[in-house]
C-alpha cells in the first residue's frame, strides 16, 4: 500500500505556496461554515488574506456550498454547487488563497476539483469507499474528517484507501468523538495516534465544541472552548488548525454557536502561532509517539 506524504504543498496557481506538515509552521483552514453569497465570501476571504499577510501564516479558505447533513430539512444549506464553483476560483485568483470545500458524492468530485485546491470528506462519510476513491482520483489534496464514531487508529484504513489509490496528499482531521447525547469530546491522544499514520494531522477546533442537534432543529455549541482546545492541539503538535469564523456568528445560517467571531480570529491565530513556535523549537511536531 502506498504511504501518505508527510508534507503537502499547495502550489498550483498560487504566488505564495502553502505547506502543511513536516514540522513546518501551522496552517489555518478558516472561513464561514457555509457560502452565503459571492459578496460575503469575497469579504471574508479578503479579511483572512490580510490576516495571513500580517501574521506570515498560510491560510486555506474554507466554506461549504451545501450543508448536506443539517439537523432539520428546513435549515439553510448554502448557495449550491453551480453558483459556488466560480466564486472559489475568484477567491483564489483575487486573494492568492488556496481553497477547500466538502464533497458529498462521487459525482461532485471532478467538478469541485476544477475549482478548489483541497477536497474535504465529511465526518459522516469518512468510510464511504467510493467517495474516497473518487476524491483521490482527482489528484487534489484530501482532508478527511474523522467520524465522530471512529477510533483514531481506525483512520489508518481510511487514509490507506486514498493513498493506496495513488494519491498520497491526504490529511486526517480530528473533530471530536461522540460522548453521550448531543455532546462531543476531544481526546488529544488521538492527534498523536493519527500522526503515526504518517500524514499531516488537522484539528478542527470549532466542530469539536459543537453540540450536534443540541438546539432541537439545529446544532448548539460552546465557542468559548475553541481557544482552549486549539491551544492544547497545537501543543500536541498538529500541522493545521481548522477554525470556522464569521463576522456575526449569532446570526449565521449554520453552526453559529461554535464559530469564532471574525474580529477575534487574528488574536487567536497569533496566540496559536506562539504555541506552535514553541512546539517547533522543542521538536514536538516531529517526535515519535513515546519518544
Predicted region positions:
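Glycine-rich, proline-tolerant flexible connector loops at the mouths of alpha/beta enzymes
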Residues: 28-41, 59-81, 245-259
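Catalytic beta/alpha-barrel core
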Residues: 79-80, 94-108, 117-130, 141-152, ...
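Active-site-adjacent loop and "lid" segments of alpha/beta metabolic enzymes
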Residues: 74-82, 95, 118-125, 181-188, ...
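N-terminal small/glycine-rich loop or linker at the start of catalytic domains
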Residues: 16-35, 64-74, 200-215
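N-terminal amphipathic alpha-helix/helix-capping segment at the start of soluble metabolic enzymes
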Residues: 1-28, 86, 277-291
Amino acid at each position: 500500500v502506498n504511504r501518505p506524504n508527510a508534507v503537502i504543498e499547495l502550489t498550483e496557481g498560487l504566488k505564495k505556496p502553502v505547506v502543511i506538515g513536516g514540522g513546518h509552521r501551522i496552517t489555518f483552514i478558516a472561513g464561514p461554515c457555509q457560502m452565503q453569497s459571492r459578496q460575503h465570501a469575497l469579504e471574508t476571504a479578503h479579511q483572512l488574506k490580510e490576516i495571513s499577510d500580517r501574521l506570515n501564516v498560510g491560510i486555506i479558505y474554507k466554506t461549504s456550498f451545501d450543508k448536506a447533513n443539517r439537523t432539520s430539512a428546513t435549515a439553510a444549506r448554502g448557495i449550491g454547487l453551480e453558483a459556488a464553483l466560480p466564486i472559489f476560483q475568484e477567491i483564489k485568483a483575487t486573494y492568492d488563497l488556496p481553497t477547500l470545500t466538502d464533497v458529498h458524492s462521487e459525482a461532485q468530485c471532478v467538478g469541485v476539483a476544477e475549482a478548489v485546491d483541497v477536497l474535504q470528506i465529511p465526518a459522516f462519510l469518512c468510510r464511504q469507499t467510493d467517495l474516497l476513491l473518487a476524491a483521490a482520483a482527482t489528484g487534489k489534496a484530501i482532508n478527511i474528517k474523522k467520524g465522530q464514531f471512529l477510533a483514531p487508529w481506525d483512520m489508518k484504513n481510511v487514509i490507506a484507501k486514498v493513498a493506496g489509490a495513488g494519491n498520497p496528499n491526504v490529511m486526517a482531521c480530528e473533530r471530536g468523538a461522540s460522548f453521550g447525547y448531543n455532546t462531543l469530546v476531544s481526546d488529544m491522544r488521538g492527534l498523536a495516534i493519527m500522526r503515526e499514520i504518517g500524514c499531516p494531522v488537522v484539528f478542527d477546533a470549532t466542530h469539536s465544541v459543537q453540540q450536534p442537534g443540541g438546539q432541537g432543529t439545529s446544532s448548539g455549541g460552546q465557542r468559548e472552548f475553541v481557544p482552549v482546545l486549539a491551544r492544547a492541539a497545537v501543543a500536541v503538535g498538529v500541522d493545521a488548525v481548522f477554525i470556522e469564523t464569521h463576522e456575526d456568528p449569532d446570526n449565521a445560517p449554520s453552526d453559529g454557536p461554535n464559530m469564532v467571531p471574525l474580529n477575534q480570529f487574528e488574536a487567536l491565530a497569533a496566540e496559536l502561532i506562539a504555541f506552535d513556535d514553541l512546539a517547533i523549537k522543542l521538536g514536538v511536531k516531529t517526535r515519535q509517539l513515546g519518544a
